[in-house]
Amino acid sequence: MGSTPTVVLVHGAFADASGYAEVIRELQSQAVEVRAPMNPLRGLAFDADAIARYTTTIEGPIVLVGHSYGGAVISQAAPVVNDVIALVFLSAFALDKGESCASIQEPFPPSLLASTSVPSPYDAPGAPHGPDLFIKIADFHQTFCADLPAQVAAPMAVSQRPLSAAALTEKATVAGWKNLPAWYLLSGQDNAIAPDCQRFMAGRMKAHVEPVSEGSHAAFIARPDIAAGLILKAIKTT
């Protein structure tokens, strides 16, 4: 490998890039260049295009990292990102062509998120159709980040960024992971994406798996050392 890659961190639903703060600090302490753009959360094709366009500002090789819905976005974006060399999924969706974030979960027991997310009473701005989705504030801690202290989860709950419902049912048109090495942080106590669903997606990618047995959907926030370590492995072995 030539020049050191830049790591692009793509957040998922009900969150923003600030969730990566400690991961960023860990990576920067190892002299890794990092970027953490906003994911619009409007629809899979739209969001992937936004991330792909953002990467045109970066010179040299790129490692794309996605959490949750952000995993679907990086896999959709990867084929049109110049010089992407690896994908890292943090408790994330890794879709095949023709799958959606909703359909990939159908063979598995419903997650807690299925009963704690609620639609907005308005159409999602900038989305093709349907409402935005939020997690009920009272249920956010248990659903999204049960391994974080309540005082940390509370501001996350009230500042969550909604995901358009359309984004969950929009089908992937490509599977970027099929042509790239992949790493996967698997959260064993995830209440948003069933751990068995994560195992299935990681297994078919033949990803290098880092299990966090007690990890919530936000395990990368609770254990930034593990998340950053996985990203560093992707950098060093690609």
Give the ranges of each region predicted by the language model.
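Active-site catalytic motif of lipid deacylating hydrolases and related acyltransferases
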Residues: 2-60
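Conserved loop-alpha-helix segment in the C-terminal half of the alpha/beta-hydrolase fold
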Residues: 188-221, 233-234
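Short, proline-enriched alpha-helix->beta-strand connector loops that line the catalytic pocket
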Residues: 5, 177-182, 205-208
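Flexible "cap/lid" loop of the alpha/beta hydrolase fold
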Residues: 83-128, 164-167, 201
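Short beta-strand/loop motif that positions the catalytic acidic residue
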Residues: 184-186
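Active-site nucleophile elbow and catalytic-triad environment of alpha/beta-hydrolase enzymes
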Residues: 155-176
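Gly/Ala-rich beta-loop-alpha elbow adjacent to hydrolase catalytic centers
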Residues: 65-70, 74
